[in-house]
Amino acid sequence: MTVSRFQMLARSLGVAGMVLIACVAKGDVAAKYAEPEGGEVKNGVFEDDYFGLRYRLPSGWVEDLKGPEPSASGYYSLAALKPEGELVATMQISAQDDFFAPEPAKDATGFLNAMKKGLDTSLSAPKAVAHVKLGGIDFARLDYSGAGLSHIVLATEIRCHALIFSITARREAAAEMLVESLRKLSFMQERSATSSNDTAVRGGWPLCVPESSYSDHIAHKVDPVMTGPRYGSVPVRLIIGADGKLEHIHAIAGFPEQVKSVTEALAKWEFKPYIANGQPVEVETGLLFQFPSAPPQRNSGE
């Protein structure tokens, strides 16, 4: 059985941006904060603490090969699932960081509409993107088919990420069976808000704030030392406490020496508390550090 074109595209994007991951925390807080790529299958249940996600695999299903490391565009291959016996269907669980997406979408519906527009002409997607509720959370749903395979992609927004479940099956009934299994999803915390309200605080997650809305809260910063290969980039997620102290640095991707340069610089940054509804709150934001090419060298005779 072949994988869906969407899965191949997603994996190829991940491979293209495959780099060493570095997770650096200020002080002794590394174990306190989960990261998206930390999900795993344990005793038949896929668990990802960053998204608060718990998904019990259908009976007879197992984890397939591990996917690529997170990419420079913030794409995560979280888990690939398959049946132990005949390969009648597959499921890919992935996530796209909204802060670093090549073409950021406003919401999960926009994400799937963009995907639909980008489908190969050999694929058929006559239905509009629909909406379903899975595990008490609103998801957008895209159905398409081609080459004798049925595809269903489900997406929702959590912590400024598109969380994606991609299903490929030989028969439509097998695909729908997997959708039914997703109705038993559980989320340990409520979804994080993307605006300044108390939803994220009630849910126990930091408030998700884009860089454009948080830049005024940077009180002091130190630029990273320009090092490593030309044209490199390091996307970073930061968690800043309600008191304005830097709590966690997650360098998503990057060349090792550039990741080291960025994290060492960030450890010296200072922030102002972020106020939401009159109260200082913990926030999560994203920054992209670019490493430009070295300036041209002058001839010794100039």
Regions found by a protein language model. Name each.
Residues 44-48, 78-81, 130-132, 142-144, ...:
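Short acidic-hydrophobic surface loop/beta-edge motif
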